[in-house]
Design a protein with these regions (language model features):
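Canonical radical SAM enzyme core domain
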Residues: 5-13
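Aromatic-lined glycan-binding groove of carbohydrate-active enzymes
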Residues: 13, 22-24
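Glycine-rich anion-binding loops and their surrounding alpha/beta cores
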Residues: 19
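Auxiliary Fe-S-binding modules of radical SAM enzymes
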Residues: 24-148
Length: 148
């Protein structure tokens, strides 16, 4: 997981990808990469002027696309956080290297408390309407990526 864009730079993001790839090659311990964008709007660190604004959507898209390339053969699953970037953003990330849209969630409040406005949960039907227009199959999976 890379929670990014509160205080670090793109150079730090790249360094993170390189280091986690090396760690994955040694341990095989990661099942996915989740590039969580910093939601700044109501975040205390942002309101105290101790952080930058959250990333632009372009930065978010590029981090996920570069992660797909950087982790090739090491980490197979790249997850988009729909609760942080919304349905439209998630669709775009699915076209830029992501293959996972995460979970349904129930009463999600961490991102909402920070200012995100993309909802507290999604139904399986909502996920289907998100991925099917892209010609992508919707699959239920376990935490370790076994499909059901």
């Amino acid at each position: 997981m890379l929670f990014r864009s509160s205080i670090e730079s793109p150079v730090a993001w790249a360094r993170h990808l390189v280091r986690t790839r090396a760690l994955q090659q040694k341990t095989g311990g990661f099942t996915e990469f989740v590039g969580l964008p910093f939601v700044h709007m109501a975040s205390p660190i942002y309101l105290q002027r101790k952080s930058r604004r959250g990333p632009t959507f372009r930065e978010t898209l590029l981090v996920h696309a570069v992660a797909r390339l950087a982790y090739r053969g090491a980490i197979d699953n790249i997850q988009a956080s729909w609760v942080k970037i919304g349905v439209d953003g998630t669709r775009q990330l699915l076209q830029a290297g992501c293959n996972d849209v995460g979970g349904t969630l129930m009463n999600e409040n961490i991102s909402r408390a920070a200012g995100a406005s993309h909802g507290q949960g999604m139904t399986p039907e909502s996920f289907a309407s998100l991925v099917e227009p892209l010609g992508r199959p919707l699959r239920q999976r376990t935490t370790l990526y076994a499909t059901r």
